[in-house]
Amino acid sequence: MQPEYRIVQNIKKLIRSRGGWCVKIHGGPYQDAGTPDILACYKGRFIAIEVKTSRGVARPEQKVTQRAITGSGGYALITHLIGDVADVLDAIDEL
């Protein structure tokens, strides 16, 4: 199992290596609850990624945010696998 920060770093490297933009969001008292860990743009598409360790569980507000993003036409996922992010990037490539 990789620590969450290492998973985040690997996901950021993947997105950037494919020409995308991304930023790690650091939560705090002024941050909306449920804001994903990584916000990205890839080929004009908005992607929000909540990173968990393999034992991590999404909080209810994270699930609400995920539904709001997908309902607005963006891509949102909660994952601990870099392969899940690669799958989203591949799907965007095929649009």
Task: Report residues per predicted region.
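Catalytic phosphate/metal-binding cores of nucleic-acid and nucleotide-processing enzymes, i.e., regions
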Residues: 1-95
